[in-house]
Regions:
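Flexible secondary-structure boundary motifs
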Residues: 64, 68-174, 178, 182
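Extended intrinsically disordered or low-complexity regions, especially N/C-terminal cytosolic tails and loops
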Residues: 1-60, 117-121, 152-225
Length: 225
């Protein structure tokens, strides 16, 4: 990211600062000039590595923030659209309880084209990246590392004779962040202006079960004294 600047220049500046500091306390009777230069070089390298780690953390945090904002707005819009022909008291908790894959399936049923699109694949990958960033090891990490190894460019885990990525190896570049952002923009543009209940196919079985579950929760809540 731009605020991290030129890392080579940053390293040289750090070396210069270190040498200026050591020069003030240099004792020619005891100190080795070459050792000071070696220490300055190591100081520059260590500083650059700390910047790289910070940059990676910032990129992951920004990716997570962008995704959560998108996810929230998408669920809110889905509820608004469905409330035109469904009971809002039923669909609101149901939509918020859906995982991201289920939400996309619901939108596909409504009429959006998501599967087998570049932006759909990026959105699904982004969701997995954020889950791994938040929760570490788990199903999301295993799925992401097997289907999208590009987010684990430097695997460090050892399993037998193989090197496998760990959840700590997760990495997002600036280019990949832009791809996620572009996918979100493309998705919003792909949403049709109108969705009509009469054009929907039969409700899939998984959706019927979720609706019934939400109805049951609503009835149970209404019967409480």
């Amino acid at each position: 990211m731009s605020q991290f600047g030129d890392l080579t220049q940053e390293a040289e500046e750090r070396e210069k600062q270190f040498l200026e500091y050591t020069a003030e306390h240099f004792n020619p009777d005891f100190d080795d000039p070459m050792a000071a230069y070696e220490q300055a070089y190591e100081e520059g390298v260590n500083y650059v590595w700390s910047l790289i780690e910070m940059q990676e953390t910032v990129l992951l945090a920004v990716t997570a923030g962008m995704y959560h904002q998108f996810d929230k707005k998408l669920r809110e819009k889905t509820i608004r659209e469905l409330s035109h022909w469904c009971d809002k008291e039923i669909i609101t908790p149901m939509v918020w309880d859906l995982n991201f894959d289920q939400l996309l399936k619901l939108l596909e049923w409504i009429g959006l084209k998501i599967d087998e699109t570049d932006y759909g694949d990026k959105l699904k990958a982004c969701a997995l990246v954020v889950n791994v960033y938040k929760h570490g090891d788990g199903n999301s990490h295993r799925l992401l590392s097997s289907t999208h190894p590009e987010y684990y460019p430097h695997p460090t885990g050892i399993c037998g004779r193989h090197i496998n990525p760990t959840h700590d190896d997760l990495h997002v570049t600036e280019e990949q962040f832009v791809e996620f952002a572009d996918a979100i923009t493309t998705f919003w543009k792909a949403i049709p202006e109108y969705c009509y209940y009469s054009e929907l196919s039969d409700e899939p079985e998984w959706l019927i079960k979720l609706v019934k579950k939400s109805e049951k929760k609503l009835r149970k809540g209404n019967t409480r004294p």
